[in-house]
Swiss-Prot record:
Its main location: membrane. This is Putative oxidoreductase MhqP. The keyword Membrane applies. Induction: Repressed by MhqR. Strongly induced by stress due to exposure to 2-methylhydroquinone (2-MHQ) and less strongly induced after diamide or catechol stress. Not induced by oxidative stress due to hydrogen peroxide or methylglyoxal. It comes from Bacillus subtilis (strain 168). Putative oxidoreductase that may contribute to the degradation of aromatic compounds. GO terms for cellular component: plasma membrane. Belongs to the DoxX family. InterPro entries: DoxX, DoxX-like_oxidoreductase.
Length: 129
C-alpha cells in the first residue's frame, strides 16, 4: 500500500508542477507564457524577467516529469525547493503564513512533500534504471 500512496503523491506533485511550468513556458491553462510571465517577474524586481520565466518554467516542467516518472527525485525536490523558496522570498513571504491571504503555507507544503518523497524514495511504481 505504501507504494500506491507514494505513486499518488508523486503524480499529484508532478501534475501541479507540470501545470505551472506549461503556464509559464507556453501560456497554457490561462498562463501568460514566457513574455507575460517575464513582464510580471520584472514588475516584482526579478530581472531579466524573460530569463527568470524560462528557467522557472523549465524547472517546474522538468521537476514535474521527474516526480511523475519517479526518477531522480532528489534533483526534482531540489528544483522544487529552489523555485518555492524564490516564490516565498519575492511574493508570498510578506503576506504571512496563511494561504488564503496569499501567504507561504502552500509553498512550504510543496517543499516538505517533495523533500519527504525524495528521502523515502519513489516506491515500486516508478521507472527504475
Amino acid at each position: 500500500m505504501e507504494d500506491a500512496g507514494l505513486l499518488l503523491i508523486r503524480i499529484m506533485i508532478g501534475v501541479v508542477f507540470l501545470f505551472y511550468g506549461t503556464q509559464k513556458l507556453f501560456g497554457w491553462f490561462g498562463g501568460y507564457g514566457i513574455k507575460g510571465t517575464g513582464q510580471w517577474f520584472e514588475s516584482i524586481g526579478v530581472k531579466p524577467g524573460n530569463v527568470a520565466a524560462a528557467l522557472s518554467g523549465l524547472g517546474e516542467l522538468v521537476s514535474g516529469i521527474l516526480f511523475i516518472l519517479g526518477v531522480f527525485l532528489p534533483l526534482g525536490a531540489a528544483i522544487i525547493t529552489i523555485i518555492m523558496l524564490g516564490a516565498i522570498v519575492k511574493v508570498h513571504g510578506a503576506k504571512g503564513f496563511a494561504n488564503g491571504a496569499g501567504g507561504f503555507e502552500y509553498n512550504l507544503v510543496l517543499i516538505a512533500v517533495s523533500i519527504g518523497v525524495a528521502l523515502i524514495g519513489s516506491g515500486a511504481y516508478a521507472l527504475h534504471f
